[in-house]
């Protein structure tokens, strides 16, 4: 089935045809419908969501700039092979407002069928641009704290601090620093804006797995099952 929908109450329930697409096709959609206009550097899957052969949504899966650090902040026993991160997700503007939640639900099922060894699907909600992860909350993702962050923007395009070298270090000149932050004078010269804020961690589970997370005087038991979470607290709380 290429694509279909059924009615449930007053809302359409879409059945997407999900298949891998080229990086170029994904990037065209992202540039048109995603606020960042860019792709993360480490991408493993470019997934297209089709209705009647029309590409209406895109999700990229891969890892961020510090893959191992990211997952081990939540689960110390896991590694990069155990999770994938949603790098970009977007849909055409014609799709109804509940469509992204349906897309996420069907994405989890696609992962369960095609990457059965995966344990965690992870994402960030970019609070610095007013994103607090409503679509992920509606899709049963679990909030896992936040990270203080910063970003730069030039000509309306978000620039990660690790990309600053391309603007500030002359071509051919070696610089051993991982990040290079611009001075006030350089920001004025190149028209770069600087923002500080929070990025929110959210995740959902793909497999049945059990973790013990040690706290000062208590432990927490968390069971994960195909996108639905059951949490049983022995004491303490998850934050």
Map each language-model feature to its residues.
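C-terminal catalytic/acceptor-binding lobe
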Residues: 187, 191-201, 206
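Extracellular structured ligand-interaction cores
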Residues: 44-46, 138, 199-201
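Conserved beta-hairpin
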Residues: 30, 44-63
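Short amphipathic alpha-helix that is part of the acyltransferase structural core
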Residues: 5-41
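A short catalytic or substrate-binding loop motif that flags glycine-/basic-rich loops and adjacent residues
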Residues: 39-43, 194-197
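Low-complexity basic/metal-binding stretches
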Residues: 200-203, 211-221, 225-239
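Acidic, Ala/Val/Gly-enriched low-complexity intrinsically disordered segments
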Residues: 2-4, 223
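Acyl-donor binding region in acyl/amide transferases
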Residues: 20, 62-192
């Amino acid at each position: 089935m290429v694509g279909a929908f059924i009615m449930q109450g007053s809302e359409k329930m879409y059945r997407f045809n999900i298949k891998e697409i080229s990086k170029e096709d994904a990037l065209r959609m992202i540039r048109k419908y995603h606020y960042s206009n860019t792709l993360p550097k480490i991408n493993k899957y470019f997934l297209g969501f089709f209705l009647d052969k029309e590409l209406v949504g895109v999700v990229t899966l891969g890892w961020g700039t510090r893959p191992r650090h990211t997952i081990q902040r939540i689960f110390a026993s896991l590694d990069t092979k155990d999770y994938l991160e949603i790098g970009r997700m977007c849909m055409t503007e014609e799709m109804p407002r509940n469509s992204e939640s349906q897309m996420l639900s069907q994405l989890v099922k696609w992962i369960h069928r095609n990457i059965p060894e995966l344990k965690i699907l992870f994402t960030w909600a970019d609070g610095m641009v007013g994103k607090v992860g409503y679509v992920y909350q509606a899709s049963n993702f679990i909030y896992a704290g936040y990270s203080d962050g910063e970003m730069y923007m030039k000509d309306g395009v978000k620039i990660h601090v690790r990309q600053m070298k391309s603007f500030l270090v002359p071509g051919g000149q070696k610089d051993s620093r991982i990040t290079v932050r611009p001075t006030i004078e350089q920001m004025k010269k190149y028209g770069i804006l600087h923002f500080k804020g929070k990025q929110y961690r959210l995740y959902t589970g793909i497999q049945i797995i059990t973790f013990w997370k040690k706290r000062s005087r208590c432990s927490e038991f968390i069971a994960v099952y195909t996108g639905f979470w059951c949490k049983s607290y022995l004491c303490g709380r998850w934050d």
